[in-house]
Each structure stands twice: as C-alpha cells, then as structure tokens.
UniProtKB/Swiss-Prot annotation:
Organism from which the protein derives: Danio rerio
Full protein name: Homeobox protein Hox-A4a
Coiled-coil spans in chain: none
Key word Cytoplasm present: no
Region span, Disordered: 34-99, 205-245
UniProt xrefs under InterPro entries: Antp_homeobox_Deformed_sf, HD, HD_metazoa, Homeobox_antennapedia, Homeobox_Antennapedia_CS, Homeobox_CS, Homeodomain-like_sf
Subcellular location: Nucleus
Annotated region of DNA binding: 147-206
C-alpha cells in the first residue's frame, strides 16, 4: 500500500546519482583491485559483512634449515642479556662520570657503598636470649661472658653400670677410671665428675658431714687446741723455787 501510494503520487521525484566517473575522480571509489568482498554466509541473509581493503604485503618464505650456528648463538646471547638489562634498570643508576674525574684517579668508595647488599655481607645478629643458651663452642663475636659447658646426658645403661661400680667402690683409681671410661664410651673427666656428684649425694642421704667443710672449719679449732696445750705445759713445769723446797 505504501509503495503504491508513492507511485501514484505525482509529486514523487526519483533520486539522481552522479555518474561513476565522478566517484573515481573524487577518490570515493578506489580501484576494484584494492577491494575484495568476502562470500556471504547463506545462513545469515540479513547480516551483510563489510568489505576490507586488500593488503599488498607479501610474506617472505624463510628457510629454517639454512640457519647458521652463529645466528643461533647471537639470539641466545641477546635472550640471556635481556633480563640482566632489566634488573640493572631497576637498580641504582650509576654513571661512569661519578667515578672518573679530571685526573682519572678519583676514589670510587662512595659508589661501592651505594650497594650495601652486593659487596658487604651482613653479620649475624646475636640477641640476648641467644647468649643464655648453654653451648660448647662460641664464635669470636660472642660477648655473653664465660661460656658454660653442656650437661652430659648419661644413658640408662651407662647410669646403671656406674651405679654398680659405685656400690662396690666409692673411690676409683686412675687405672679403673680409664677402664670404665673406655667400656662406656665416656671420657675420663665425665666418669670422675659423676663419681664426685654421686659421693656428695650419698653423704647427703646418710647425713654425713662434708669433708671439705669439716677440714676447713677444723683448721682454726686445732690451732686453739694446740695453744691451750702449750699453756698447760708451761704451768706444770717446775720452777727453780719449787725445786729447792
């Protein structure tokens, strides 16, 4: 109905288009060889695809079988050198002008200090709680006082054998101490210290006085006894007057 109304109406004017030659002269329509139209998909008749200009670029074929080993080495060198250049860009920028002066003998110590982690190794930090640990050996930088010896942990078998020996002999000779240390895989000093501690415990259990304390305390008492005895002897000696009587 609408199309018929346009045709019936006498005022309808058909649009006029310029000839194709003017399009070629004004550059609106390029040469037909520069354009190509892709085939339309018959499944989608309502969607028209736009035309794209053809590319005049021709890809050159390359023969990979004729690649020389020098080219491969150059490529690998450039590939490995790229991460190093990236890391250098992120680091501090140091120019050679800062090291080289007018006479060429300028000191570059300041430049080396700019990289604290590269040349100087960090010293281990020793905290106070680390100094209180019982250790056998300490480093030269240790300043926590005299190092303490580690306590010997005797096994159950070693403690049992030492108890048996202490039951028969509370004091060991040098020869017997060496034999026990050799059979129990201990040092002579460890056996000696164990017997000393065991004797102290035995005296404490039997409520016996300590010989070390008794010897130190008995020394001045003996001195007083000797002085009293000399005084009594002097009083008992006969005088010349009593002998004449």
């Amino acid at each position: 109905m609408i199309m018929s109304s346009y045709l019936i109406n006498s005022n309808y004017i058909e649009p006029s288009f310029p000839p194709c030659e003017e399009y070629h002269q004004n550059g609106y329509m390029p040469v037909s060889s520069d354009y190509y139209e892709r085939p339309k998909d018959p499944g989608f008749p309502h969607h028209e695809e736009a035309s794209y200009p053809r590319s005049n670029y021709q890809e050159q074929s390359y023969d990979y079988g004729n690649v020389s080993t020098n080219d491969l080495n150059d490529f690998s060198d450039r590939h490995h050198a790229q991460p190093q250049s990236v890391s250098q860009n992120h680091g501090p920028r140091l120019t050679t002008e800062s090291c080289v002066g007018s006479d060429g003998n300028k000191d570059c110590s300041l430049v080396s200090d700019a990289l604290p982690g590269s040349q100087k190794s960090k010293e281990p930090v020793v905290y106070p709680w680390m100094k209180k640990v019982h250790v056998n050996t300490v480093t030269a930088s240790y300043s926590g006082g005299v190092p303490k010896r580690s306590r010997t942990a005797y096994t159950r078998q070693q403690a049992l054998e030492l108890e048996k020996e202490f039951h028969f002999n509370r004091y060991l000779t040098r020869r017997r101490r060496v034999e026990i240390a050799h059979t129990m895989c201990l040092s002579e000093r460890q056996v000696k210290i164990w017997f000393q501690n065991r004797r102290m415990k035995w005296k404490k259990d039997h409520k016996l006085p300590n010989t070390k304390i008794r010897s130190s305390s008995s020394a001045p008492s003996n001195h007083h006894v000797k002085t009293d005895a000399t005084q009594q002897q002097q009083t008992l000696l006969p005088t010349p007057c009593s002998s004449n009587l």
